[in-house]
Design a protein with these regions (language model features):
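Conserved AMP-binding/adenylation subdomain of ANL enzymes
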Residues: 65-83, 93-133, 148
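Short beta-strand->loop structural element characteristic of the AMP-binding/adenylate-forming
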Residues: 17, 56-58, 107-116, 144
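Structural motif
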Residues: 33-36, 76, 127, 153-156
Length: 169
């Protein structure tokens, strides 16, 4: 959970575990880039399965990037320097959508944990503290806040917030 010291991990053969302070001390890291064609395979994502069995769909690098840039810059009006937050896990397709905000020269804010840990409106506190301009969340989270009668506007200054995106049901 946020703010809690990481647990002592058992040593697992072949797995190295580092904390953030250790990573920040690494002096040099050589990254080797490889050039691929526009139509090169990027990722396989699965359909939700709401209309039958889930289907695997191969997405291509260039097409995904162009589609995401269109959605981010035209539909969501994200500009360079904006701060973007989308509550997601790396196993959900929204993770891929979140990462590509970097191509619009926006910063992304990541959160790992239970969104109501010790505070029902924790994610909106993050939005206020980090001056988030695009805030992405699930419909279930919004519904839960409504059921608990949480009044976000009276608690947090969200003057930088331009758009709230919601997914799911």
């Amino acid at each position: 959970y946020p703010g809690k010291k990481y647990l002592k991990y058992k040593k697992i053969k072949g797995i190295s575990i580092f904390n953030l302070s250790q990573i920040s001390k690494i002096q040099k890291c050589e990254i080797k880039f490889k050039k691929f064609d526009f139509d090169h395979e990027l990722v396989i994502l699965y359909s939700s399965g709401t209309t039958g069995k889930p289907k695997c769909i191969c997405h291509r690098a260039g097409g995904v990037l162009l589609q995401h840039l269109k959605e981010h810059q035209l539909h969501c009006e994200v500009k360079p320097g904006d701060n973007v937050f989308y509550f997601t896990t790396c196993g959900w397709m929204m993770w891929n959508w979140l990462l590509t905000f970097l191509a619009s020269k926006a910063s992304i804010v990541l959160f790992d944990g239970f969104p109501m840990y010790k505070k029902n409106d924790l994610l909106f506190k993050i939005a206020a503290d980090e001056k988030i301009s695009l805030f992405g969340i699930s419909a279930k989270y919004i519904d839960q806040l409504r059921k608990l009668n949480v009044k976000i506007k009276s608690i947090y200054k969200l003057s930088k917030l331009k758009i709230i995106c919601s997914t799911g049901s």
